[in-house]
């Protein structure tokens, strides 16, 4: 189950931002009760500059009304808030400290200044625009080998393309479609080109549709 520090604190938002960096929702491929729980724990929209992934996720959930959120898929996974570290006992506090501790603190501060000075000298890193995409890949019929179909899809390699989780979803009459998540670098991967590559496996694939698309 997802676990974070207090989501009203900077530590909690840092953890949430990292957690949803490659996800659209907290659990699975559709909004669920876990998203509502986390949304209520965050309370206010995260800063889009400091926490872009958390802000994108928060705004997605905020776009649904309370009534709509109540209709989200109910999941067994729940969001937990990790207990903060216990404060140091009073009788363990050294009110006067020691020379060794003073020296260590001085060295630590000196090292921090060195690191900050080096960071200013480093060229700024270019932000790489990425997108999280959910594809629906439909077979011709119920006799299509879905294991081979998925192998074919995952065999596609493109610079800037990373395949993620997948599952088979029933669509009726014994037919199942492949729902697969992927992350692409926008400047390197064309979704149209990717769809055409998947459709080239014409013995298995009838159609490819984008079910969800989110900038990350």
Curated annotation (Swiss-Prot):
Regions that span the bilayer: none
Subunit structure: EF-1 is composed of 4 subunits: alpha, beta, delta, and gamma. Interacts with actin.
Keyword line: Cytoplasm, Elongation factor, Protein biosynthesis
Function statement: EF-1-beta and EF-1-delta stimulate the exchange of GDP bound to EF-1-alpha to GTP.
Gene: efa1B
Main localization of the protein described in the UniProt heading: cytoplasm
Record-level GO cellular component terms: cell cortex; cytoplasm; cytosol; eukaryotic translation elongation factor 1 complex; phagocytic vesicle
Lineage: Eukaryota, Amoebozoa, Evosea, Eumycetozoa, Dictyostelia
UniProt-recorded Gene Ontology molecular function terms: actin monomer binding; guanyl-nucleotide exchange factor activity; translation elongation factor activity
Location(s), subcellular: Cytoplasm
UniProt protein name: Elongation factor 1-beta
PROSITE patterns hit by this protein: EF1BD_2
Family: Belongs to the EF-1-beta/EF-1-delta family.
Domain of life: Eukaryota
Gene Ontology annotations of biological process type: actin filament polymerization; response to bacterium; translational elongation
């Amino acid at each position: 189950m997802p676990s974070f520090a207090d989501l009203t604190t900077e530590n909690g938002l840092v953890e949430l931002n990292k957690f949803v960096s490659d996800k659209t929702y907290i659990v699975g491929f559709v909004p669920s009760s876990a998203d509502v729980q986390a949304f209520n724990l965050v309370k206010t929209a995260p800063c889009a500059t400091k926490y872009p992934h958390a802000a994108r996720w928060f705004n997605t959930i905020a776009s649904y009304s309370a009534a709509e959120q109540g209709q989200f898929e109910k999941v067994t996974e729940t969001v937990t808030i990790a207990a903060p570290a216990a404060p140091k006992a009073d009788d363990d506090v050294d009110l006067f400290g020691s020379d060794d501790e003073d020296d260590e603190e001085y060295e630590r501060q000196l090292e921090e200044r060195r690191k900050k000075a080096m960071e200013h000298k480093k060229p700024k890193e270019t932000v790489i625009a990425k997108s999280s995409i959910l594809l629906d890949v439909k077979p011709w019929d119920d006799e299509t080998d879905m294991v081979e179909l998925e192998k074919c899809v995952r065999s596609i390699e493109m610079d800037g393309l990373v395949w993620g989780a997948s599952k088979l979803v029933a669509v009726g009459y014994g037919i199942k479609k492949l729902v697969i998540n992927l992350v692409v670098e926008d400047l390197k991967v064309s979704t149209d080109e990717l769809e055409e590559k998947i459709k080239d496996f014409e013995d298995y694939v009838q159609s490819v549709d984008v079910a969800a698309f989110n900038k990350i």
